[in-house]
Amino acid sequence: MPAIASSPQSRSTDMAVRHDWKRSEIDALFALPFNDLLFQAAALHRAHFDPNAVQVSTLLSIKTGACPEDCKYCSQSGHYNTELEKEKLLEVSRVVEEARAARQNGASRFCMGAAWRSPRDKDMPYVLDMIRQVKDLGMETCMTLGMLNEGQAGALAEAGLDYYNHNLDTSPEYYGQVITTRTYNDRLSTLANVRDAGMKVCCGGIVGMGEERNDRVGLLQQLANLPHHPESVPINMLVKIEGTPLADVDDLDPFEFVRTVAVARILMPQSYVRLSAGRQEMNDEAQALCFMAGANSIFYGERLLTTDNPEANHDQRLFKRLGIHPLDPRHEASDEAHEEAIQAQVSEQQAEEAGLFYNAMDSKRTAKHVLDKDTGRPTATEH
């Protein structure tokens, strides 16, 4: 059967990673029938990842409350009365203790967040020590500390920080309805400083803040058209906090959330797409659909900064029911391994007279690339 190369659907499953997505193309993906969208997202997910492996992170608030920013969704903003108890920067020993417990519960990455506009010079030595000591536990490290200049990014990288989280939150058009104390360009500048320092980028957004679908399209377009896709893309569902301006916005349709996850997977096929804030509000069935749509990372544990998160034991039971398992970071594919998997998929499809595009009409033979448990390299099988 000839390849279908002219439609947005078939272009989405081209194995080449793109940075030139048009809004009309992303609109077309969102508009697909739900089953078709999930099928395409799942096909791309399987081409790049073990579909039953989920990267597990734990997030700890190392400095809580009194943030000078006015993000309308955030309980930590000093602009709103959310009755959140303020806390100073945690002691390094306490952070290491929490990281050790997270590792014992199956987390491979430990993320540390501070409610700052930007790190202060006097706090940096403690932050850098946290990174070093958590790394000594054999865990990956991630931080979110607000805006970074070049010097701060360089210091974090030198200490060994693996990932830096700095979300775009929403589309450029809707951004001013949510935040006024920090510009969109401020966020993009921090991301550039992080990337230039050699760290990996964790960057996503929040949905369900009263935005339109066009804003979700715009957010994903911004992420997918960055010079390098974020290695990790957290998709947050708004957690409504009493006292914040967004406490009473209408709920987002769960299927629209799943669609957002699926489109993120298609646009950024090599990135980890993380179910982040808001999982507490999702039932197991909605989470299962997200995993099917290409989500392959979660935050694990009872707290996500200052909001509830599903308990670790519940996550373990859900993983068992779905037949999925935490990803061992030692078996994560390198960039070269991802490229090898891409080339293998392309070659196989060419041999099947399907051009460079996945043929959604022929479901009898699908290439499945998984990671060999011993080598961490991709292998190709058929099913």
From Swiss-Prot:
Residues that coordinate or bind [4Fe-4S] cluster: C67, C71, C74
Pathway annotation from the record: Cofactor biosynthesis; biotin biosynthesis; biotin from 7,8-diaminononanoate: step 2/2
Needed cofactors: [4Fe-4S] cluster; [2Fe-2S] cluster
GO BP annotations, alphabetical order: biotin biosynthetic process
This enzyme's EC code(s): 2.8.1.6
GO molecular function, one term: iron ion binding
Cofactor details (free text): Binds 1 [4Fe-4S] cluster. The cluster is coordinated with 3 cysteines and an exchangeable S-adenosyl-L-methionine.
Annotated Radical SAM core domain residues: 52-276
Uppermost EC category: transferase
Keywords from the named record: 2Fe-2S, 4Fe-4S, Biotin biosynthesis, Iron, Iron-sulfur, Metal-binding, S-adenosyl-L-methionine, Transferase
Binding, [2Fe-2S] cluster: C111, C142, C202, R274
Keyword Transferase: yes
Reactions that this protein is recorded to catalyse: (4R,5S)-dethiobiotin + (sulfur carrier)-SH + 2 reduced [2Fe-2S]-[ferredoxin] + 2 S-adenosyl-L-methionine = (sulfur carrier)-H + biotin + 2 5'-deoxyadenosine + 2 L-methionine + 2 oxidized [2Fe-2S]-[ferredoxin]
Similarity comment: family membership: Belongs to the radical SAM superfamily. Biotin synthase family.
Function field: Catalyzes the conversion of dethiobiotin (DTB) to biotin by the insertion of a sulfur atom into dethiobiotin via a radical-based mechanism.
Complex and partners: Homodimer.
Protein name: Biotin synthase
UniProt organism field: Alcanivorax borkumensis (strain ATCC 700651 / DSM 11573 / NCIMB 13689 / SK2)
